[in-house]
Amino acid sequence: MPAVKSCRLRPLARAAHPLFAMSLLLCSPAWADEPVRRTYQVAPASLGAALTRFADQAGVSLSLDPALVQGRQSAGLSGAYSVDEGFAQLLRGSGLQWLPVGEGAFTLVPAPQAGSALEIAPTSIVGGLVAPGQSQPYAGGQVARQGAQGLLGSRDFMETPFSITSYTSEVVKNQQARTLGELIASDPSVRATNPAGGRFEQFTIRGFSLFNSDVAYNGLYGILPTYSIDMEMAERVDIIKGPNQLLNGISPRGSVGGGINVQPKRAGDKPITMFTGSYASDSQVGGAVDIGRRFGEGDQFGVRFNGVKQAGDTAWDHQSVDRQMAVLGLDFRGERLRLSADLGHTERDTDAPQERVLIGANAKVPDADDVRHNYAQAWSKARTNDTFGALNAEYDISDSLLAYGAVGARKSNHDFLRHNVSVINDAGNFSVQPRDFTRDESVRTAMAGLRKWLQTGPVSHELNLAASYYYMDFTNGGARYAAAPSNLYHPVATPTPGTPTRFDSKVYTENRFSGVALADTLGFFDDRLLLTLGARWQRVQVDDWSDGVKGDTAYDEEKVSPSGGVLLKVTEQLSLYANYMEGLSQGKIAPSTSVNEDQIFPPFTSRQVEVGAKYDFGQVAFTASAFRIRQPAYETNPASRVFGPNGKRDNRGIELSVFGEPVQGVRVLGGVMYIDSELTDTVDGAYDGNRAPATPEYNVNLGGEWDVPGVKGLTLTARGIHSSSQYLDQNNSKKIDGWERYDLGARYAFKVDETEVTLRASVENVLDDRYWSSTGAPDDSEPGLTLSTPRTYLLSATVGF
C-alpha cells in the first residue's frame, strides 16, 4: 500500500490557478470543513524535524522535497491548533506553504509569487501517524516506522542508533499469530526455545535468553502474563536488539540479547467493530472481537476492547489448549493532558504440555523424525491465570517540557502437574517422575520522567530524566510422586499421580529493582548528526525464604551503567550508526536439577558494541549491523552437579534485514543473522574456544506476499525459516542438525454491501518435517531439546461492520 494516497493532478495554465487550488481543497478530508483543534507541543528545532513531529502528533502524512527545508529553523509551536493552523504557524516566514494532496496527506511547496505557476516537486515521506497511539506503517504495512525506545520515547527507525523492528497488528492478523512465540517466527534474530505445545514460551535474541517476564507492556516490565502472551491485545510489537537497560531499565530476568515491547491497542478516529472466527488443527475453534470507539467533545475519550476464546485439540495426541483473553483499553486526549488505562485478564489451560527433552551423559541425541507421539503424559497439565492493569499519563508542562509517568500491577496464579523428560540411553528410555508445582506472583511497577527540548546555539538537545521501580514477590511450592518408566519413541501411559512421596520446600522470594537514568540527544548540522549520551544507576535487591527461614544468598547491589549511541544521516535515505550499551542482569538461580538448587548468584554486567547502516528506498528498506556482546557464562557441572559461573560468552555477529513493498503488490519481510559464539576463560581452560550452546551459526528468514493480478483482494503468502546446527553443551559433545520450515497461505478480502470480509488460510510446516528446533535454555535451566511443531492448519474469517 502506498504511504500517501494522493489525488492525480495535472499541470494547469496560469489562468486556471484558482481552479487548481479549489481542486486541492476538494481532495482534503471532510473534517476540513469544521476544523478540529487539538493541543500540540512541538519544540524548537530544524524546520524538517518540527514539521515531522507535528505531522506525527496530528496523525497525518507529510511529503516534501528535503532540499526545501535544508538549513531552515523553526520556533516550534504550543497550544490548540487545527491541522491547517499548525502548518501555517510552523511555516510562517519560511517562504513555503502546505497543500493537501489526499485524505490525511499533505505536501510542501514553495509559496508562489504573484503571477507564477504552482508546481509540486518530487517528494519523500518524512512523518505522520495513522492515529494517536498507532505508528505509521512502512510500505507494505508489515513493519511500523516508529518504535518505542523507553527513555527516549518513540522514534523513527531511521533516526535510531539501535537495531529495532516494529511489527504491526496487520502482520499479526495476516500471519494468524495467536501468541508472541508465533509472531517472532518472522525475525531472524529471534528464536523460540520451548515447544509450541509447552507450558510456557521462551526465546533467544542474538543468542541470549529472553523470558516473557522481560517483555514490556507499553514500557512497563512485569505486567504481561508470565507464561504466554496473546497477540490479539497488541497494536504493535517492538523488538530491539542488544542490551537496552539505558532505555528500559533492568528487566525482571535480566535478558541482555534484546528487548520486546507490546504496545496496547487504542481507539482510532474511525469506529471499529470486527469479529473473527478461527480454526486451528486438530480441532481448536474460537472467536475474537475487536471493538473501538471515540466519543465526547473533539473525540477526547476512547475505548477499545479485545476478547478471545479458543479451545480444542492440537496436532499432538491427547493435547488440548483452552485460552481466554479480555483486554480493555481506555484513553483521554486533552489539550495538555493525555491519559490511558489498560485492564486485562487471561487464562490458559493446557493438557499434556510438552517439555524440553533432556539428554543424559550416556545417551546420544535422539532422532526427532522418530518422535511421532506426544511424550507428555495425558494427566499432565498447565493452568495459568493472570490479571493485570496499567495507567499511563503525559502532561505538557510547556511547549518544550513534557512530564510522563506510569504505574502497573499484576496478580498471577499458576498450577502445574508435570514431569521431566530426561532420556538416559540411546533407546530413548526416561523416567516419569510427576511433580506438582504451584507459583503465585504479585507485581507492582512504576516509572516517571521528564523530557525537555532546547537549543544551545546551533545544537539541539533532547534531555531525558527518568526513574523506575519494580517489585515482585512470588511463592513456589509443590510435591513429588512415585516414578514410572516411559519411552520417547513409544510413550507408556503411567498412572495419574496419587499420594506424594515428598513435599517441596515452600520458597518465597522478593525482588526490588530501582533506577534513575539521564540521557541527552544532541543534534548537530540540522539534526543530521545525533549523539545520545547517558547512564542509568540501578539497584538490585533480592531476598528469599525457604519454609519461613531466610536464605543466605540474598543480595543488595547497585551499579551505574553508561551507554551511548551516534547516528549520522548521510542522506535522507542513508543512516549510519554505532552504539555502546551496558546491561545489568539479576543473578542466576541454580536450577532444580543441580545439587545447590535455588542458590541465588550476584548480578552481572553484559556489554555490547554495535555498528550499523540503514537505507530507506521509500518502498523497501535494508538494515545491516555488526555487534559483539559479552557476558558471564553459567553451567551445571556434569560430574558434581553443582551450578555456577564458568567463563564468559562472547557473541560476535552480523544482521541483515529487509522489509517493504519493492514492487506494487509484492511485499517482503526477512533477513539473516550470523553469530560466532565463543566460550572464553572457562575453568582450567577446559571449554575455551568452544561454541556456546544453543547458538546456531546462521538464522535465515524470508517471507513474501503477492497480490494476484486480476483477482482483487486475493493475496498469496509464503515463508521459509532456517537455523543451522547448534550444540547442546559447553563440551560441544552433542549437537542437533540444522533445519528448515516452510509455510504457505492465502487470504481474500472483499465487501458484501458495506461489510468488509477477510478470509485467511495458512499451513505451517507444510512438509510436516520433524526436527529439533533448538537446544536452547537459559543458563539457570538444564539444557534440552525443543521438538518442532507438526504440520498445522490455520483458518479464519474476519468480518468488519
Segments (PLM) and residue ranges:
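Gram-negative outer-membrane beta-barrel transporters
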Residues: 526, 628-630, 645-730, 798-800
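Acidic, small-polar-rich N-terminal luminal/periplasmic segments of exported/outer-membrane proteins
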Residues: 61, 76, 121-270, 611
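Conserved C-terminal beta-signal and adjacent last beta-strands/turns
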Residues: 578, 609, 693-801
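Structural signature of Gram-negative outer-membrane beta-barrels, strongest in the C-terminal barrel
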Residues: 331, 441, 456, 460-462, ...
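Surface-exposed extracellular loop regions of Gram-negative outer-membrane beta-barrel proteins
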Residues: 349-363, 471-480, 567-610, 621-646, ...
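Acidic/polar loop-and-plug regions of large Gram-negative outer-membrane beta-barrel proteins
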Residues: 310-312, 327-396, 409-441, 480, ...
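Outer-membrane beta-barrel translocator/receptor signature
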Residues: 232-235, 245-326, 332-338, 387, ...
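Membrane-embedded beta-barrel scaffold of Gram-negative outer-membrane proteins
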Residues: 392-396, 402-408, 414-418, 576-577, ...
